[in-house]
Amino acid sequence: MAMLQRQTYINDIVNRLSGLASSVELRGLLNLLDLHVISEDFYVDLLNLIYGWKLRNANSLQQNAPGIDLVDDSNRILAQVTGTSTKGKIDHSLKEIPEKYTGYHFYFVPIVIDAKEQRKYKYNPPHEVVFNPKTDILDIHFIANKIKGMPNIADIDTIAMFIKNNIQNDVPDTTQLTSGLNYIISQLAEDLSLIHI
């Protein structure tokens, strides 16, 4: 039964995160960037839940912090949350990292489904900043796989509830829809069996 619940959680997580990505992309094309800013705070909590980090929004520490959006000083982690997933954006983010973050680990968090193209490139992080594009680009596909691989269903439940509480989704719950349809079909079959022709 836990395997079925795991799948239900993962399906809901994927639906909600991909819905967020679509909204961020479309709103970005329309130059409506409010969701980009709100997403930074969402990702602070999401990444802290998944990885056990202590990220804070860097923009609350310094208005429009260059190159980074999220900081965890105790674990020496930096992250850039963006609706843009290009090599140029990663290069620019790395270039803008202040020297005071020498030796920190940098994560690029594009709010897109799949940023696999960006993993193919070579990057030159400054100030001995650690950045491996194969493991440090946290797109939705990467994050969903990370959650899916968690051994503890209670952790997945916590993350799924956090996402559900933060991302409203107009996609109907197919599990409830299917069980509702099954009920209607069984009732119709029962009613039809009572009709004598």
Regions found by a protein language model. Name each.
Residues 195-197:
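Conserved small/polar residues in nucleotide/adenosyl-binding loops
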